Amino acid sequence: MTRLAETFARTRAEGRAALVTFVTGGDPTPGDMGPILDALVAGGADVIELGMPFTDPMADGPAIQRANLRALGAGTTTADLLAIAAAFRQRHPSVPLVLMGYANPMVRRGPEWFAAEAAKAGVDGVICVDIPPEQDGALGPALRAAGVAPIRLATPTTDAARLPAVLEGASGFLYYVSVAGITGMQQAGQASIEAAVARFKAATDLPVAVGFGVRGPEQAEAIGRVADGVVVGSAIVDLIGEHGAAAAGPVRDFTATLSAALRRAAQEKAA
């Protein structure tokens, strides 16, 4: 069983949603990433998403765009990201780590090279934002061959006709982008999230994680009542932008409030 499968099985057995946290790799500098990632784990994150900084992050809102600029300004490269991942894996052998980003840095040296290096670094999954599943004839197969999960995105516009294409070859979990827009936007209504999660769960055995627009414990708790995972990114990235190299403490404390919220949701479901 993979680390992702084991983690979602464990959180399911505990009756709660997994906490999936996102930070941009290399923000504020590559050297600051170790303490920040450790803080996420210490705060109760179950899965870590590490964003690959890119010059044109079209799916990201202002917070993550600024994080990309900070990371690139610090000279962060794909090699740095892989080194950060490998060091994280040594410190945290059982915590799943997912790389998330855009196609250009993933395929620049060839998808097979990227997939092999990601696997070597201990990466469990990859989310590529801008390769539609219908056009994923190279990266997805390379990831699967290397034992890395290609994690797919579904959106509010993913209808019954397109959903099979999204799920074809997907593994790890299904990431539901709950708003049709950029990261950090206002969260979608709870009723629409619940309906979407139910629809996806009826179509796949993969865990369904919900993200985009989840900014605090109350939202996380509400989504945690219905989803298998809750993804929080922009709110954490904002803390890093505010505190810089001293962000580890605030990140740990905020992550702990999110983790506690998901445990409250589990208690409410069990009551």
Swiss-Prot record:
Gene Ontology MF terms in the entry: tryptophan synthase activity
Q: Does the keyword Phosphoprotein apply?
A: no
* PROSITE patterns linked to this entry: TRP_SYNTHASE_ALPHA
Which residues does the entry assign to the active site, renumbered to this chain? 49 (proton acceptor), 60 (proton acceptor)
* Main EC class the enzyme belongs to: lyase
Instruction: Report any Pfam family annotated for this entry.
Output: Trp_syntA
Q: What is the superkingdom listed in this entry's lineage?
A: Bacteria
EC number, UniProt record: 4.2.1.20
Copy the pathway line from the protein's UniProt record: Amino-acid biosynthesis; L-tryptophan biosynthesis; L-tryptophan from chorismate: step 5/5
**Keyword Oxidoreductase recorded:** no
| Keywords, sorted A to Z | Amino-acid biosynthesis, Aromatic amino acid biosynthesis, Lyase, Tryptophan biosynthesis
One GO cellular component, as annotated: cytosol
Catalysed reactions, as listed in the record: (1S,2R)-1-C-(indol-3-yl)glycerol 3-phosphate + L-serine = D-glyceraldehyde 3-phosphate + L-tryptophan + H2O
Please give the function described in this protein's UniProt entry: The alpha subunit is responsible for the aldol cleavage of indoleglycerol phosphate to indole and glyceraldehyde 3-phosphate.
Q: How does it assemble?
A: Tetramer of two alpha and two beta chains.
Query: Which family is it part of?
Result: Belongs to the TrpA family.
Specify the protein name.
Tryptophan synthase alpha chain
The gene coding this protein: trpA
